[in-house]
């Protein structure tokens, strides 16, 4: 019967790297037998006499050796043991793989014979717990290797901190007496793995504690927390845990292309390298963007990082960054941020000053800003370049300061406007508008509506002069004829006030006219005309009227020129006969034209109105002051900041 395929599994018959081979003796009957192979001869054992070790001879030989040879042998053994300790400490143990420990101990050749294809591709791990060199770190938490010696002397342990952990070894040696001995104590302590820290209930608290333990300062003392991950900022403070030494050394090179300023500190611990960064990026970034960037560059998990913006107004924090930046424990790249220089450099301390409200009021006046919120926002933006604005931000009464500034600015603006004539006011407004307008756009629009240009100029001249019975112009027409567009464009250019009849139930609905050079009432309806006919006849005449103003007694003033738009021609309607001679009516019968793209055919903007008034200046009888010299400004420059005396040496 044929033998079965394969092997029978008996010892020595498989393909294990070696084989049992039996000797084949070819001998026939009658052949001469060699004396060496005579099986009939008796074995007396005399041929093995030379291989027997005689203990007496060995002891005799040992006694004859010199003391120098014994010392040399013992010293060589001591050196071999010391080298072995270093190898076991710094070289990777062959038993690092737990699953292969048993096979490796039985026979290294068995592991070499493998029919499976092993993958040798390099795998990049975020956290790798390396073997310390003393055997199976995961199995043996504490291994003691002792060699008998005459004295037990311990030396301090040396620690090496790598990617996520390190090892600890103790070496002790001694000499004296009759013999030589040494003791090697190899102590493997349980390592605090960064992954185990992240699995705790409060990983951030553990990282904060470790940071304070290493750097001696609390991380929260250096940063101001951002609750939202979407909040953007250019300056960021970053603490990263569990970095490898090679990456920690290359951070400066990796981040230079992204930042303008870089401050790096790195310390080693049982978690690995802990790096503290102060970074000023080239553009504003949020926390999520920084996490994605650093997790790729530094090969660290976002959970192992604390990212917050630094404290910009803390002198203690600024001094910390300044002192560590000039020491040898930090690497610095780029120019120092201004918020550090402002609090640490002596010259910046000299430049600090107390807040002066007059400077803030002068700034608001020069920029024509009278709104509280706009003043607060725009003046705070000047803190980096304006010392008075910086002092304003340090004040604890910013709201009161802003309110006082806006109030004073409005007072100055109101007084300035009140002392100007209509000609001065139009010139003042023209100086604040760029050139390049076309006055013909306004003329063509009036002709399109059938308004004679010369009659409009005559009415406008009397309107601006405030002549009684000519102090009010009515733009009458159907819907969508451009009445409101024409009137609003003129109000915007002359910075007039607009009132609305919807507020007529209030006693103060006419208050905007008290501080205006020109006013407008848009879309007057029948109730509005009834109210005007009953209460505002003197106002339309341009005479003195009594007006109720908030927080002030009744104010007596002359009503400014008033422009009214309406779908009702009150100048001819029989319901209001007493308004007929008080209104100058212009009718707009045609619908306002637009081109195929939806843009107005006639542009009514500030530039065109400036060109219009400049072109018709003499026809409108607008005269400038005669004392104006060399085309200078007719109005002196307002200055509310007190003068400063020059110190003389």
UniProtKB/Swiss-Prot annotation:
A motif (Nuclear export signal) lies at residues 106-115. HPV16, in comparison to HPV types 6 and 11, is more often associated with malignant genital cancers in humans. It is found in: Host nucleus. The keyword Ubl conjugation applies. ATP binds at residues 477-484. GO terms for molecular function: ATP binding; ATP hydrolysis activity; DNA binding; DNA helicase activity. Its EC number is 5.6.2.4. A motif (Nuclear localization signal) lies at residues 87-89. One of its GO terms (cellular component) is host cell nucleus. Can form hexamers. Interacts with E2 protein; this interaction increases E1 DNA binding specificity. Interacts with host DNA polymerase subunit POLA2. Interacts with host single stranded DNA-binding protein RPA1. Interacts with host TOP1; this interaction stimulates the enzymatic activity of TOP1. Phosphorylated. Sumoylated. The keyword 4Fe-4S does not apply. There is a cross-link at residue 558 (Glycyl lysine isopeptide (Lys-Gly) (interchain with G-Cter in SUMO)). ATP-dependent DNA 3'-5' helicase required for initiation of viral DNA replication. It forms a complex with the viral E2 protein. The E1-E2 complex binds to the replication origin which contains binding sites for both proteins. During the initial step, a dimer of E1 interacts with a dimer of protein E2 leading to a complex that binds the viral origin of replication with high specificity. Then, a second dimer of E1 displaces the E2 dimer in an ATP-dependent manner to form the E1 tetramer. Belongs to the papillomaviridae E1 protein family. Its main location: host cell. Coiled coil: none annotated. SUPFAM superfamilies: Origin of replication-binding domain, RBD-like (SSF55464), P-loop containing nucleoside triphosphate hydrolases (SSF52540). Residues 451-601 form the SF3 helicase domain. This is Replication protein E1. It comes from the Viruses. The gene is E1. Disulfide bonds: none annotated. GO terms for biological process: DNA replication. The modification Phosphoserine is found at residues 93, 107. Residues 624-649 are annotated as: Disordered. Keywords: ATP-binding, DNA replication, DNA-binding, Early protein, Helicase, Host nucleus, Hydrolase, Isomerase, Isopeptide bond, Nucleotide-binding, Phosphoprotein, Ubl conjugation.
């Amino acid at each position: 019967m044929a033998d079965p395929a394969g092997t029978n599994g008996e010892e020595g018959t498989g393909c294990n790297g070696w084989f049992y081979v039996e000797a084949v003796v070819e001998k026939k009957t009658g052949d001469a037998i060699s004396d060496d192979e005579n099986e009939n001869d008796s074995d007396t054992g005399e041929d093995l006499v030379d291989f027997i070790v005689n203990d007496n001879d060995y002891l005799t030989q040992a006694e004859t050796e010199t003391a120098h040879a014994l010392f040399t042998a013992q010293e060589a053994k001591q050196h071999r043991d010391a080298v072995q300790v270093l190898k076991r400490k710094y070289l990777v143990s062959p038993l690092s793989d737990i699953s292969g420990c048993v096979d490796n101990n039985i026979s290294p050749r068995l592991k070499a014979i493998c029919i499976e294809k092993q993958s040798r591709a390099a795998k990049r791990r975020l956290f790798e717990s390396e073997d310390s060199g003393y055997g199976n770190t995961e199995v043996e938490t504490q291994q003691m290797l002792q060699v008998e010696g005459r004295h037990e002397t311990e030396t301090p342990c040396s620690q090496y901190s790598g990617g996520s952990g390190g090892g600890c070894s103790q070496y002790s040696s001694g000499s004296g007496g009759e013999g030589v001995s040494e003791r090697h104590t190899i102590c493997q302590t349980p390592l605090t793995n960064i992954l185990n820290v992240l699995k705790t209930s409060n990983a951030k608290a553990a990282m904060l504690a470790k940071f304070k333990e290493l750097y001696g300062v609390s991380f929260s003392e250096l940063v101001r927390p951002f609750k939202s991950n979407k909040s953007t900022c250019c300056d960021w403070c970053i603490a990263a845990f569990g970095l490898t030494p090679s990456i920690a050394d290359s951070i400066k090179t990796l981040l230079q292309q992204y930042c303008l300023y870089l401050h790096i500190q790195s310390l080693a611990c049982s978690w690995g390298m802990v790096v503290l960064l102060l970074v000023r990026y080239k553009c504003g970034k949020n926390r999520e963007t920084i996490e994605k960037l650093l997790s790729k560059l530094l090969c660290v998990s976002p959970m192992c990082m604390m990212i917050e913006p630094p404290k910009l107004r803390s002198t203690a924090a600024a001094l910390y960054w300044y002192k560590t930046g000039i020491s040898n424990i930090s690497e610095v790249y780029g120019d120092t941020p201004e918020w550090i220089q402002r609090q640490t450099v002596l010259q910046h301390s000299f430049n600090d000053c107390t807040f002066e409200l007059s400077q803030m009021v002068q700034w608001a006046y020069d920029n024509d800003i009278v709104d509280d919120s706009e003043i607060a926002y725009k003046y705070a933006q000047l803190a980096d370049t304006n010392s008075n604005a910086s002092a304003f931000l340090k004040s604890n009464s910013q709201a009161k300061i802003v309110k006082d500034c806006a109030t004073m600015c409005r007072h100055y603006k109101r007084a300035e406007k009140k002392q100007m004539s209509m000609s001065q006011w139009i010139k003042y407004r023209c100086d604040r508008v760029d050139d390049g307008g076309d006055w013909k756009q306004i003329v063509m629009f009036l002709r399109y509506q059938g308004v004679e240009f010369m009659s409009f100029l005559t009415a406008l001249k009397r309107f601006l002069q405030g002549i009684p019975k000519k102090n009010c112009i009515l733009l009458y027409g159907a819907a969508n004829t451009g009445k409101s567009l024409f009137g609003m464009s003129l109000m915007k250019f002359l910075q007039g006030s607009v009132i609305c009849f919807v507020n007529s139930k209030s006693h103060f609905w006419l208050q905007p006219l008290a501080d205006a050079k020109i006013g407008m009432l848009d879309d007057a309806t029948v109730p509005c005309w009834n109210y005007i006919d009953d209460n505002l006849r003197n106002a339309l005449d341009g005479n003195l009227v009594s007006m109720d103003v908030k927080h002030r007694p009744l104010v007596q003033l002359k009503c400014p020129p008033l422009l009214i738009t309406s779908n009702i021609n009150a100048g001819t309607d029989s319901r209001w006969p007493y308004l007929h001679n008080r209104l100058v009516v212009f009718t707009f019968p045609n619908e306002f034209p637009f081109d195929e793209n939806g843009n107005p055919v006639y542009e009514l903007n500030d530039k065109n109105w400036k060109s219009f008034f400049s072109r018709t200046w003499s026809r409108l009888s607008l005269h400038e002051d005669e004392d104006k010299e060399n085309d200078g400004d007719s109005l002196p420059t307002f200055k509310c900041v007190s003068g400063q005396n020059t110190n003389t040496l």
